[in-house]
């Protein structure tokens, strides 16, 4: 009686017919029945295991379709980004603006400059004719130069970095 309640263990071919080796592909049983191909395990026997690899072959033994894998870049890989080119913002001396006004405009237009740096920049422009205000990316340099010009100072930019 106990023997009648037991079912025979599924065979390897029964397991192959019910499971699809790759998600999203047609089940092997229907594809194999239509094409006349055989299904072979890559490791020979079909012992219980977590991963199975199957190869579909033609009757003459040629491989019909080989699995392809795509390698994803490691998540920890950092991509190097190019830094934008650096431009110098130059302040030129003029005989029209007072020194205090030049310092005030420098502090207003260039956010990262300190009072001491603004005074030093103004003094250098007065003594040598030109002074380096700041070296920064091109878009910031153009904005600073335009801001200085709109406030009546003479300013230029040129490529080059520190």
Swiss-Prot record:
Gene Ontology terms describing biological process: protein catabolic process; proteolysis
Keyword Chloroplast carried by entry: yes
InterPro entries in alphabetical order: ClpS (IPR022935), ClpS_core (IPR003769), Ribosomal_bL12_C/ClpS-like (IPR014719)
Alphabetized UniProt keyword annotations: Chloroplast, Plastid, Transit peptide
Lineage: superkingdom: Eukaryota
Transit peptide range per the UniProt entry: 1-58
Main location, first listed in the record: plastid
Gene Ontology CC: chloroplast stroma
Subcellular localization, as worded in the UniProt entry: Plastid, Chloroplast stroma
Family the UniProt entry places it in: Belongs to the ClpS family.
Known role: Small adapter protein that modulate the activity of plastid Clp protease system (CLPC). Probably involved in substrate selection for plastid CLPC.
Matches recorded under PANTHER family: ATP-DEPENDENT CLP PROTEASE ADAPTER PROTEIN CLPS1, CHLOROPLASTIC
Name of the protein this chain belongs to: ATP-dependent Clp protease adapter protein CLPS1, chloroplastic
Species of origin: Chlamydomonas reinhardtii
Gene: CLPS1
């Amino acid at each position: 009686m106990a023997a009648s309640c037991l079912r025979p263990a599924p065979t390897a071919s029964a397991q192959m017919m019910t499971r699809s080796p790759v998600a999203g592909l047609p089940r092997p049983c229907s594809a194999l029945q239509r094409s006349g191909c055989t299904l072979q395990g890559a490791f020979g026997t079909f012992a219980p295991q977590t991963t199975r690899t199957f190869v579909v072959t033609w009757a003459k033994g040629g491989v019909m379709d080989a699995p392809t894998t795509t390698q994803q870049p490691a998540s920890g890989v950092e991509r190097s980004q190019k830094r934008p080119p650096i431009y110098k913002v130059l302040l030129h001396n003029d005989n029209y603006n007072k020194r205090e006004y030049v310092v005030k405009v420098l502090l207003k237009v260039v956010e990262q400059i300190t009072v001491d740096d603004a005074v030093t920049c103004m003094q250098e422009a007065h003594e040598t004719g030109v002074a380096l205000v700041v070296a920064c990316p091109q878009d910031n340099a153009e904005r600073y130069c335009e801001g200085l010009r709109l406030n009546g100072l003479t300013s230029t930019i040129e490529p080059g970095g520190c």
